[in-house]
């Protein structure tokens, strides 16, 4: 079931692109230049504690509650979700019981659950699991992103997985962590990387959400 997002309230928005913290070398290597930050706000906050969660290698997926009905979409309005994933999403979020949970939890508020569709046949997801599923990493109600505790409460209500917190720490600590090429916390997969957010929700002077990622492949 796919929602036509044209004309729908802008909080049905796509998840923002998450940038790496550092600039890339422009002299041919294309490698990240550690310490040369792309965003002044991230540079300012680099020694603060950030919450780092595991970045899952899958397909970005939105579960959308418009106040009355649930629907599913990919990262962009045109993105096509695999049929196996749509079937799993219907299992996790479809039907009368889940509709009652949406109504009880959110009423007529506009809600987007952001997650990753992952598993066999999606990217290199077969090492995570042999089937496909959805793992929650963020949620937005009426244009406001929710706290980690709220996200965990939603995951509990629907009996779905949520991306694990790997640690709280600085940007440099996250970089050193991925340099060690750690194992994923799921299945036998190698970890793709980490996504970091300040312990409190922040935006920069342009109103852009402060969030970043460090990927293993960028530090090999």
What do these predicted regions represent?
Residues 6-220:
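Core nucleotide-handling region used for phosphoryl-transfer chemistry
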């Amino acid at each position: 079931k796919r929602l036509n997002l044209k004309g729908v309230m802008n909080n049905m928005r796509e998840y923002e692109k998450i940038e790496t913290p550092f600039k890339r070398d422009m002299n041919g290597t294309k490698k990240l230049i550690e310490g040369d930050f792309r965003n002044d706000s991230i540079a300012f906050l680099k020694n603060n504690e950030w919450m780092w969660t595991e970045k899952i290698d899958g397909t970005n997926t939105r579960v959308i509650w418009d106040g009355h009905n649930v629907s599913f979409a990919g990262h962009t309005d045109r993105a096509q979700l695999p049929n196996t994933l749509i079937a799993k999403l219907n299992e996790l979020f479809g039907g009368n019981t889940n509709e009652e949970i949406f109504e009880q939890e959110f009423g007529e508020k506009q809600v987007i659950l952001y997650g990753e569709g992952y598993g066999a046949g999606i990217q290199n997801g077969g090492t995570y699991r042999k089937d496909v599923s959805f793992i929650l990493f963020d949620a937005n109600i009426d244009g406001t992103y929710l706290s980690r505790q709220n996200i965990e409460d939603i995951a509990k209500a629907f009996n779905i997985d949520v991306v694990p917190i790997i640690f709280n720490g600085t940007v440099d600590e996250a970089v050193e962590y991925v340099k060690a090429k750690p194992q994923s916390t799921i299945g036998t997969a190698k970890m793709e990387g980490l996504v970091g957010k300040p312990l409190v929700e922040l935006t920069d002077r342009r109103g852009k959400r402060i969030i970043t990622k460090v990927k293993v492949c960028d530090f090999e």
